[in-house]
């Protein structure tokens, strides 16, 4: 049992005065499991504010109270099961669904879920989304944006985790394989996609974003449901969820397409959740990388890495997300190193200095064409790809979970291999303004026909589609990404250096402004 000194301290500062005597609406008799008094008080307090739709208190409980109690009492054990909580909240089914969402998420995060728990969590998400979607009028539920994002994020994560778990057939007991075979529709890709697209449609979020992008009033097209923050934000977060899900399936075109109304270069009310912002840019950048749109990938990674640098202190206050964000940060520096090797570009000075600090040795190996290093960087930084279908349970047991990854790795490495000679050719072209084809072919120990093919490859690979304006990330203009261009006149290569001289004046001006701001802040102390 816990003492009175262990008062719940995660919610409102006035919690003890206002609720310490609150006994709840239901019977506190909860069977054989003895729910600690502090947890009872927390559940009563939590339930009361969910009923009252008190957004400020719910956010405080969600971001602070629940995590503090988890660290204190349930770091290595699950929270009490919902059946033991039900009497404390008069069997309130909506609250119990929300509680179970946190309950199963904690198990996934801190413990190892059983097959039954994976199934039960799926059914709980079905109950939650059915409650929100299968209604003729908006439901009376208010949740903070952070929780709404985490619901969508966790929903996709658990689908991904189950898909990989189901594909690891080696060393699985036969009875467990039989259970998986008999329940092939649980965590089915179609049901996951259906939920996300239904939330997008219910919220009319694409219509709202179209109106927002033209400086109109989104409320005019939001409809009965989309005007409510619950539906609006779930709709927006579902777009990001679809970006992630299509990327996990290897459909990068569709991944970018679902964001056709999202203007990434514009700060909006939708981009105030750091984890959502970082997830968006990571998956958009990765999709661009796999589509050979390296300049767009570099732009995305640079933008979000600069954002992480500037908000690092704020992100540290949310410790439950900080580790994952820092891992994404490292992954994106690796992906940026790959993109810069394949398509050298100028970077923001702050991002460039961090890249040198983190990836100098890797960059050197990548620039030398070390295929092993390309594979290592890709393996560490790519998403955990999944198959859209269950494995063949009747085939000999094997770990099929690596098949989607191996396919994407093969596609990526084939592209890298095709470009392996480009850095070498570029280094020679930089040295001359004209050069006979035969002479440069001799330098590279190639026959003339093979070298002509390599020059054509250079031209083709260094000309990419680049986004320039608008909200549709698939749009763009064909641009040459190389700082060295050339044309061939008969047997002579004519070379032009298109590199733009670095404007050092802008760099020094930025530093002067920073020091000026720092001086003003010091004077104000």
UniProtKB/Swiss-Prot annotation:
Region (Disordered): 1-21
Entry keywords, A to Z: Cytoplasm, Initiation factor, Protein biosynthesis
Keyword Protein biosynthesis carried by entry: yes
A cellular component annotation (GO) from this entry: eukaryotic translation initiation factor 3 complex
Alphabetical list of PANTHER family matching this protein: EUKARYOTIC TRANSLATION INITIATION FACTOR 3, EUKARYOTIC TRANSLATION INITIATION FACTOR 3 SUBUNIT L
Gene3D superfamilies the record matches: Tetratricopeptide repeat domain
Subcellular location: Cytoplasm
Role description: Component of the eukaryotic translation initiation factor 3 (eIF-3) complex, which is involved in protein synthesis of a specialized repertoire of mRNAs and, together with other initiation factors, stimulates binding of mRNA and methionyl-tRNAi to the 40S ribosome. The eIF-3 complex specifically targets and initiates translation of a subset of mRNAs involved in cell proliferation.
UniProt feature, compositional bias: Acidic residues: 1-19
Pfam families: Paf67 (PF10255)
Record protein name field: Eukaryotic translation initiation factor 3 subunit L
Main location group: cytoplasm
GO biological process: formation of cytoplasmic translation initiation complex; translational initiation
Boundaries of every PCI domain copy: 296-502
Quaternary context: Component of the eukaryotic translation initiation factor 3 (eIF-3) complex.
Entry's family note: Belongs to the eIF-3 subunit L family.
InterPro entries, A to Z: eIF3l (IPR019382), PCI_dom (IPR000717), TPR-like_helical_dom_sf (IPR011990)
Signal peptide location: none
GO molecular function: translation initiation factor activity
């Amino acid at each position: 049992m816990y003492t009175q000194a262990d008062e719940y301290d995660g919610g409102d500062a006035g919690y003890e005065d206002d609720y310490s005597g609150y006994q709840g609406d239901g019977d506190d008799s909860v069977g054989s499991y003895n729910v600690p008094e502090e947890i009872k008080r927390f559940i009563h307090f939590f339930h009361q504010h969910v009923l009252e739709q008190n957004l400020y208190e719910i956010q405080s409980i969600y971001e602070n109270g629940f995590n503090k109690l988890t660290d204190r009492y349930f770091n290595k054990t699950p929270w009490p099961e919902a059946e033991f909580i039900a009497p404390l909240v008069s069997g309130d089914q909506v609250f119990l669904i929300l509680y179970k969402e946190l309950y199963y998420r904690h198990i996934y995060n801190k413990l190892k879920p059983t097959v039954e728990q994976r199934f039960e969590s799926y059914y709980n998400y079905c109950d939650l989304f059915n409650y929100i979607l299968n209604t003729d009028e908006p439901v009376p539920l208010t949740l903070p944006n952070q929780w709404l994002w985490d619901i969508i994020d966790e929903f996709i994560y658990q689908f991904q985790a189950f898909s990989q778990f189901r594909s690891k057939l080696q060393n699985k007991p036969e009875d467990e394989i039989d259970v998986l075979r008999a329940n092939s529709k649980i965590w089915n890709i179609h049901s996951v996609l259906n939920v996300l697209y239904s939330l997008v449609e219910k919220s009319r979020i694409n219509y709202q974003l179209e109106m927002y992008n033209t400086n109109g009033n989104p409320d005019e097209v939001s409809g009965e449901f989309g005007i409510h923050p619950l539906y609006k934000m779930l709709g927006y977060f579902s777009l990001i969820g679809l970006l992630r899900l299509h990327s996990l399936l290897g459909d990068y075109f569709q991944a970018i397409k679902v964001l056709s109304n999202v203007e990434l270069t514009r700060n909006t009310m939708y981009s105030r959740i750091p984890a959502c912002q970082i997830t968006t840019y990571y998956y958009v950048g990765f999709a661009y990388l796999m589509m050979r749109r390296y300049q767009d990938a570099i732009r995305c990674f640079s933008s979000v890495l600069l954002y992480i640098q500037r908000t690092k202190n704020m992100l540290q206050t949310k410790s439950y997300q900080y580790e994952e964000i820092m891992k994404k940060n490292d992954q994106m520096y690796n992906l940026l190193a790959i993109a810069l090797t394949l398509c050298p570009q100028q970077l923001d000075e702050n991002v460039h200095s961090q890249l040198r600090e983190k990836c100098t040795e890797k960059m050197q190996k990548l620039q030398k064409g070390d295929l092993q290093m390309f594979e290592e960087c890709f393996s560490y930084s790519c998403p955990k790809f999944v198959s859209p279908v269950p494995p063949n349970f009747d085939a000999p047991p094997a770990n099929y979970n690596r098949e989607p990854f191996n396919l994407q790795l093969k596609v990526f490495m084939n592209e890298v291999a095709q470009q392996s000679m480009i850095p070498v050719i570029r280094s020679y072209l930089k040295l001359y303004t004209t050069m006979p084809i035969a002479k440069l072919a001799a330098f590279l120990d190639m026959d003339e026909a093979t070298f002509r093919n390599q020059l054509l490859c250079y031209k083709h690979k260094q000309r990419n589609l680049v986004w320039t304006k608008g909200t549709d990330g698939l749009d763009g203009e064909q641009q040459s990404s190389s700082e060295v261009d050339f044309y061939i006149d008969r047997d002579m290569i004519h070379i032009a250096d298109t590199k733009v001289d670095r404007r050092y004046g802008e760099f020094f001006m930025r530093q002067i402004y920073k020091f000026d701001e720092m001086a003003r802040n010091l004077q104000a102390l």
